[in-house]
Amino acid sequence: VIKHSKNRKNISDFSLNDVWSENKILKKDFKKLHGFFWLFTLDLNSSKKDVQNTLLKWFKKYHNYNAYSWEIDLLSKRIISWISNTKITYEGSDEIYKNEFDYLIKKQVNHLINEIDRSEKIDDKIIGCAAIILAGVSFNDKTKFLNYGLSLLKRIINNTFDRNGFPKSRNLRQLTLFLKYFILIREWLKESQNDIPEYLDEIIYHLGQAYNLISKDSAATFLFNGCLLYTSDAADDET
């Protein structure tokens, strides 16, 4: 889900002056930039000031809804990235910055809650669900985020998997994606000392069994429905 680069980069290695410029960039690059998963590639010894200044520029320019930078998948990844990297995105900042950071996290989560049921993309739903739950365990005053996230998680599981715990789509890439995010959610709940729902443990078990079975053939594997050839290595590289 979250790739950690073996060769960590320092924030000072990047040119940040025009990072949020209006210059046209490819949609793929735009999504990578605004999803903020690049934060996971940074050395934690990077300058907190530089990282936070970069976020502050984003705060000022994109704090209101924008159809492009507030897409569900970008919004979800951004929430996960900001919260997961608080050592460089939050710690050591002044109260004004912290208040703005907290406000924008909550604003984005509220928007996500209002929009996620309208999305027809199951990938967006699970990433969004994970982001809502992470916000819920990160803010003491936002148990409603956690409660909503867990309720959404249960609905996703009920609607997406068959009685044996297999994705109804029979898609290996989705199996891998769900397994990774479910494990992340369980770890966040455990670390925050929240109860782990039995249904989450059960689906992780079933998906893990399926993944282990399929991964034994590391060269190539057909999807469960036999329609397409898909490599397990490629699945690992997806998200």
Question: Across the structure, where does each feature detected by a protein language model lie?
Answer:
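Extreme N-terminal leader/anchor segments
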Residues: 1-13
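Single conserved hydrophobic/aromatic residue that forms the stacking wall/gate
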Residues: 230-239
